[in-house]
């Protein structure tokens, strides 16, 4: 079946490309801050190709288009791309070209590649420059062509910033700024440009509401050893925030003036930024002003190692959150087959239970409630109009979490609702074994998540089965549910950072088995890493 709506949108984009002399146009999944989850304003890729997953890049030429996404979304992408004319490219699969390889193969000498430089990270942009240089490809990044096609595009999000009691964080802003400036000095940098939203929220002990399920505010910051300049939208600024900023000698600026300010401000010495997070467009500004030092944001590792206050609050929050999940499991098992129940209505009930918890702010991601064959799609999302009815047979996979004043949660349970096959029992057991093996791990300091991944994955590998995603990720503190730099995965792609596991870090532990057309099983538990006391 032809998806005429999407084909018409692609045709409109191609017309705009032609008017602007662009032969190929690239649309990643990102906002101006390289965020994993983005507001509706930034969902350009979904608008143009119908794929709704959280990770994917669309590349459009005059005669063809392709979407690149990872193993979490292969099944979902196949369904959503049907009839669009967009080809699915399964990332990291054999004989599948990367985005760069595809462009090298398809683009002719002297052609033009376009993208919005505000939503492409510097590292990838510089790699494209290098990989396409032999063909003398021109890169244009100063215009959002899709904006001319998406005529009813939502407005840029803008919500007042929350300034919680600083006792909640275990450190005040002065202490955090001092730690960051110490790292800047160690790198020989006189300035630091920050654009990663959760890092900014952590550093200034504030929270926002500009991205669904992620308590962050669209913002930038520029630090020197003596100054801190913070850029955010007028509608995000409150009197409480003004007082908070004044207390810590933070200068507030309009968000939309960040680029212009960086082009004209006084810069002495070098500027530090993380090329994996700063946009290509902003990097070009910095590159023209000063020597740029590519280094990880100091905030990233500092944020990843939770202090005692954060850990204590997280433990309390997880206890309350777990009670809600237990109530939900009891409710589902007691009522399935007795009252009308769907994937969607079950998810709504769990969301309601969480909303009653003291300190509740929001979900930490949209609840995944997947029954039967739908659970084989790792990030399936049921809607009121498109969901399966539950019956007292098979399994319901529920992956969910909450944001609270005190922590962020992420938990998955696969609930057996009735009779299942022997194969499913064996798969369920393998997943449980993997989760328990990783939970009980003791390891030498210096290990990274790549050293530990096999503990969770081995029971699946013993059955010649694998899951096409990582095993675990860090969890933010009243921040993004996916946090780095730590993670547990066996495959190293070169784009991901590897750091030793430190005491105070946290990771999820989430092995799984996904059999297309049959079932999906995942168990996710939150794990706190601590130093092991030896005799």
Label every model-predicted segment.
Residues 381-413, 418-421, 426-427:
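Non-catalytic terminal/interface segments that mediate subunit docking, oligomerization
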Residues 119-120, 401-406, 512-516:
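Short, charged beta-turn/beta-strand-edge "cap" motif at the junction between a beta-strand
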Residues 26, 47, 59, 66-68, ...:
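Structured core elements
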Residues 3-43, 63, 178-202, 322-384, ...:
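Active-site cores enriched in adjacent His and Asp/Glu residues with nearby glycine-rich loops
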Residues 244-285, 295, 420-445, 449-454, ...:
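Conserved catalytic alpha/beta cores of large enzymes that bind or transform nucleotide phosphates
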Residues 527-535:
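Conserved small/polar residues in nucleotide/adenosyl-binding loops
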Residues 2-108, 120, 124-263, 367-368, ...:
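N-terminal accessory/capping or targeting/presequence segment of soluble
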Residues 111-131, 141, 145-149, 155-183, ...:
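Extended, domain-scale alpha-helical bundle/helix-rich regions
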């Amino acid at each position: 079946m032809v998806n005429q709506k999407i084909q018409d949108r692609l045709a409109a984009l191609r017309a705009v490309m032609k008017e602007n002399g662009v032969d190929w146009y690239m649309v990643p999944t990102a906002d101006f801050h390289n965020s994993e989850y983005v507001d509706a304003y930034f969902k350009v890729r979904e608008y143009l190709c119908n794929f709704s997953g959280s990770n994917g890049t669309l590349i459009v030429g005059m005669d063809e288009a392709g979407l690149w996404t990872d193993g979490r979304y292969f099944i979902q992408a196949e369904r959503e791309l049907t009839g669009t004319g967009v080809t699915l490219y399964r990332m990291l699969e054999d004989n599948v070209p990367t985005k760069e390889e595809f462009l090298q193969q398809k683009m002719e000498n002297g052609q033009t590649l376009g993208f919005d430089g505000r939503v492409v990270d510097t590292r990838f942009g510089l790699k494209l420059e290098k990989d396409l240089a032999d063909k003398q490809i021109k890169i244009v990044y100063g215009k959002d062509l899709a904006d001319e096609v998406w005529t009813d595009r939502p407005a840029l999000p803008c919500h007042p910033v929350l300034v919680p009691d600083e006792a909640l964080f275990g450190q005040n802003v002065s202490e955090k700024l001092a730690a960051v400036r110490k790292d800047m000095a160690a790198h020989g940098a006189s300035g630091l440009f920050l654009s990663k939203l959760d890092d900014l929220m952590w550093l200034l002990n504030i929270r926002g509401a500009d991205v669904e399920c992620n308590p962050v505010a669209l913002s930038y910051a520029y630090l020197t050893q003596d100054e801190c300049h913070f850029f955010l939208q007028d509608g995000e600024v409150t009197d409480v925030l003004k007082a908070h900023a004044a207390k810590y000698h933070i200068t507030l600026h309009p968000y939309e003036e960040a680029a212009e300010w960086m082009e004209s401000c006084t810069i002495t010495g070098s500027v530090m930024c993380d090329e994996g997070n700063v946009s290509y467009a902003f990097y070009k500004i910095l590159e023209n002003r000063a020597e740029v030092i590519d280094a990880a944001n100091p905030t990233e590792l500092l944020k990843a190692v939770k202090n005692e206050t954060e850990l204590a609050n997280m433990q309390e929050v997880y206890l309350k959150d777990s009670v809600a999940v237990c109530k939900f499991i009891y409710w589902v098992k007691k009522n399935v087959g007795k009252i009308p129940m769907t994937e969607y209505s079950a998810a709504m009930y769990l969301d309601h239970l969480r909303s009653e918890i003291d300190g509740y702010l929001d979900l930490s991601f949209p609840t995944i409630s997947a029954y039967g064959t739908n659970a084989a799609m790792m990030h399936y999302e049921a809607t009121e109009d498109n969901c399966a009815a539950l019956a007292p047979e098979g399994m319901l996979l529920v992956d969910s979490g909450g944001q609270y004043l005190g922590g962020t949660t992420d938990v998955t349970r696969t609930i057996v609702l009735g009779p299942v096959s022997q194969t499913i029992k064996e798969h369920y057991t393998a997943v449980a074994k993997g989760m328990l093996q990783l939970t009980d791990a003791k390891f030498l300091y210096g290990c990274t998540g790549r050293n530990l991944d096999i503990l969770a994955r081995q029971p699946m590998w013993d059955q010649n089965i694998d899951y096409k995603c990582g095993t675990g990720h860090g969890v933010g503190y009243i921040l993004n549910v996916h946090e780095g730099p730590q993670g547990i995965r066996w495959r190293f792609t070169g784009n991901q950072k590897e750091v030793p596991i430190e005491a105070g870090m946290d990771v999820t532990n989430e092995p799984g088995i996904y059999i297309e057309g049959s079932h999906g099983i995942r168990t996710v538990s939150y794990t706190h890493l601590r130093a092991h006391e030896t005799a």
